[in-house]
From Swiss-Prot:
TM ranges: 29-53
Protein name from the UniProt record: Uncharacterized protein C18B11.08c
Species the sequence originates in: Schizosaccharomyces pombe (strain 972 / ATCC 24843) (Fission yeast)
PANTHER family according to UniProt: ADL329WP
UniProt keyword Protein biosynthesis present: no
Amino acid sequence: MAPAELKRPDLIVPYKARVKANEEVGLSLVSTATCMAALFLRFKLIAWVAFILTFSNLLNANTSPSSSPTSMAFMGIAALVSTYLPQFLNTPNKT
C-alpha cells in the first residue's frame, strides 16, 4: 500500500513573493516630457497635463533618497507659470 501522505517535508519549498519592478519610470518620463513641452511651447493644455502628471508622480513617489519628486513638482509649477506669465506681464499698447 502507498503511504497516505506523498509529500516529503524535506522537499517543501516555501513561497517567496516576487519583488515588483520599478514601474514608475514611465510616469516620470512622461511627466518630464510634458513639462519640457509646456515650457517650450507655452501651450496651456500641455501645462495643465504636466502639472497633473507631476502631482500624481509626487503622490505616488517612494521615499527613496535617489529620486527627488519635489523637483519634478517645481518643474510642473514652472510649466504653469511660464504659460500664464505673459498674460500678467504684458501691458496694453498706448494709442
